[in-house]
A protein has these predicted regions:
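A short, N-terminal "cap"/entry segment at the start of jelly-roll beta-barrel domains
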Residues: 1-37, 47-48, 118-131
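A short beta-loop-beta micro-motif enriched in histidine and acidic residues
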Residues: 23-34, 43-59, 73-74, 82
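Short hydrophobic/aromatic-rich beta-strand segments that constitute the beta-sheet cores
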Residues: 36-37, 67-69, 106
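Histidine-centered metal-chelating micro-motifs
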Residues: 45-47, 66, 84-86, 90-96
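Short acidic-glycine-tyrosine-enriched beta hairpin
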Residues: 72-90
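Ligand-binding loop in jelly-roll beta-barrel domains
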Residues: 81-82, 90-117
Length: 131
């Protein structure tokens, strides 16, 4: 059976707060993956998590921030800047923050599609939450 076409624009108000605290706006999905628009407000720090079953690809649209990720003895902090792309392979611990004055926005593709709120498992934070 053919998969229906889908076209979407991010909603003005977010659809859900992700388990890490970021604002999620739903975009199209197909059987192999789903897409969302993610926003982290200025001064915000996400909660550190790892995923149970999904890989993610991020593409930064606007704002600036930092991404911490760790997996199998590898660890790094990389800048999140417009037109940069980042991978979050299954089993990676990660956290991101927006120290800037503008919202940090990016598109996330999740493979397979995001299964629900229990997908993200809390891990120890790399950065403490803002006070």
């Amino acid at each position: 059976m053919p998969v229906p076409f889908a076209t979407a624009r991010p909603a003005a108000r977010y659809d859900v707060l992700a388990p890490d605290g970021s604002q999620i706006r739903f975009l199209p999905q197909v059987p192999g993956g789903s897409m969302v628009h993610c926003t982290l407000p200025p001064g915000a720090v996400s909660l550190a998590v790892t995923h149970r079953t999904v890989d993610e690809l991020w593409y930064v649209l606007a704002g600036e921030g930092e991404l911490w990720r760790r997996q199998d003895g590898r660890e790094e902090i990389v800048p999140l800047r417009p037109h940069s792309a980042h991978s979050i392979p299954l089993g990676t611990q990660f956290q991101f923050r927006n120290p800037g004055t503008e919202p940090l926005t990016f598109v996330i593709v999740t493979m397979p599609p995001w299964p629900g709120m229990d997908e993200a498992v809390r891990v120890a934070d790399h950065w403490p939450p803002p006070k």
